[in-house]
A protein has these predicted regions:
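Double-stranded beta-helix
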Residues: 2-15, 107-140
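A short glycine-rich, His/Asp/Glu-containing loop-to-beta-strand
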Residues: 20-63, 69
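Short, conserved beta-strand element in jelly-roll/cupin
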Residues: 48-51, 65-82, 120-123
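Hydrophobic/aromatic beta-strand elements that line small-molecule binding cavities or substrate pockets
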Residues: 48-50, 96, 106
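Short beta-strand segments in beta-sandwich/barrel cores
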Residues: 56, 78-83, 97
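Conserved catalytic-core motifs of eukaryotic protein kinase domains, centered on the activation segment
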Residues: 85-87, 110-111
Length: 140
């Protein structure tokens, strides 16, 4: 099945033996691009994200949102605790999956040193914005 939006996509095959891990959005993590961003001409991105043992506070511990239309996180290893507007704190562990709805305010509370996830986001070049704490939490 093809249409005008996907006919320019290309087939990709990301081999584990050729994997390269690079810096990305957060200094405490390294990222492995799976070729989906290039293959879909930026419509989607899929990457593995893993903790590299660095300890530091960064903007993700602040309330923030991602300007995207889809974001899915599947935990490959370890755990992390996030707080979500309207949903409270959620700890995700190996094998867990989150459909993080567009525009939901959230923040990271903590993560394990072996935390690793598969993240798929649309569009590929989404932006992250720091926001005020949700009103219900700010009133507490």
């Amino acid at each position: 099945m093809t249409d005008g939006d996907t006919k320019e996509w290309t087939f990709s095959h990301s081999l584990a033996k050729d994997a390269t891990w690079t810096p990305g959005l957060r200094e405490i993590f390294e990222y492995r691009d799976l070729g989906i961003k290039a293959g879909t001409k930026g419509d989607h991105v899929a990457h593995l994200i893993r903790h590299k043992g660095k300890k530091m506070t960064d903007e993700v511990q602040q309330w923030h949102v991602h300007d995207c239309t889809f974001q899915m996180v599947y935990v490959m290893n370890g755990w992390a605790t996030f707080e979500y507007e309207g949903h409270g704190q959620k700890t995700i562990r190996k094998g867990d999956c989150i459909n993080q709805i567009p525009g939901i305010a959230h923040r990271e509370i903590a993560c394990s040193d072996d935390f690793e996830v598969l993240e798929i986001v649309s569009p590929a070049d989404f932006k992250t914005r720091i926001v005020d704490a949700p009103k219900a939490l700010a009133a507490e």
